[in-house]
Amino acid sequence: MTREHASPFALRRRSLIRMGATLAAAAPLLHARPGAAASDPKIVEAARKEGSVSLYSSASTGPSNAIAEAFRKKYGIPVTVYRAGSADVATRVQTEEAAGRPQADALIIEEPALTLLQPFLAAYDSPERAPLAPEYKAPDSTLIRMYVSQIGWNTQMVKAEAAPKDWPDLLDPRWKGRFGSLDPHVTATTLAWQVMVGQLYGPDYLAKFGANRPKLYASTNAMSQAIVSGEIEVGITNSFGVIQMAETGAPMAGVTPKHTVLFGGNIAVFAKAPRPNAARLFCDFACSAEGQTVVNVAGATIPTHPGASAPAAGNLAEMSKVHVFSQPDHKRIIADTQKLLAEWEKHVK
């Protein structure tokens, strides 16, 4: 299977609907207690001898720490988490590999950074991913969590009827200096959004977007905090950021524009993992219904395992009926990264 088939960005609309239908058909399972991961006892024993796991993750702090702690409780193996934006994670991995001193065992990351790091990943067909649809599996990675781009706003500062509902609405002068965006230098997923709006609205969109002077943030968490604190009124964020804030009672709401990007968080094992057995055991746990429930409940994201449950994240089948998901070519985005960043820097200051 090619990398393009492994990622929801590259899947056609009918495949997304079919994937959503697969999860919908499993609805009775979604409310059941997730089954426990059942890894090879020999791998468990070898992993315990290795003593720990080093996880590099671009997922938010909540889900990254939650799955690390759940793994520790289950196997007695501590997990050290390095958490950063996908661009920073990729840079750290490349730097360590170039120096001949790889430090990480396992990886949780989104595209296009996943494709960028593919040369450093090991093929691993975890037994725990057997129930997953083929679209979620590549030889060297497994899709375990999904979320979409949204527009979020502070409900105390912006009335719902006045809030921007689509990407062109952000060009309205009323939002000048009062809205935010994730920084593509730190969070590479912003490049996928940049490609999407360029295709939808033409090259002038980014110039008009920049003229409205968005404030830039390094993570979804930082963006959400800025919105609820009133530092900004509106922001381009992700569905999980809105859900998590709303669940705490914070003054934040959001909307998914008709055209949006469906992002996916993937689990992978490094080819030169210092602790290869612990890496595989962690991957098994992350792929399982048990592990996916932990990471997706903590992250307010959509699981790919039919036995996992994260009700707050929404239903992919229903979303597929009303939304058109962007399908950027990740290899092309990687090849054009410097060009895309130069275009961003030209207009967004």
Predicted region positions:
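Extracellular/periplasmic bilobal clamshell ligand-binding domains
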Residues: 312-349
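C-terminal segment of N-terminal export signals and the immediately downstream linker at the start
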Residues: 9-11, 28-49
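A ligand-binding cleft/hinge motif common to bilobed small-molecule-binding domains
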Residues: 112-118, 233-251
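Periplasmic-binding protein-like
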Residues: 134, 147, 175-185, 207-210, 216-217, 286-309, ...
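Extracytoplasmic ligand-binding site segments that recognize negatively charged/polar headgroups
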Residues: 54-68, 80-97, 101-231
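N-terminal secretory signal peptides
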Residues: 1-15, 19-31
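A bilobed periplasmic-binding-protein/Venus flytrap-type ligand-binding module shared by bacterial periplasmic
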Residues: 150-157, 194-195, 264-278, 294-297
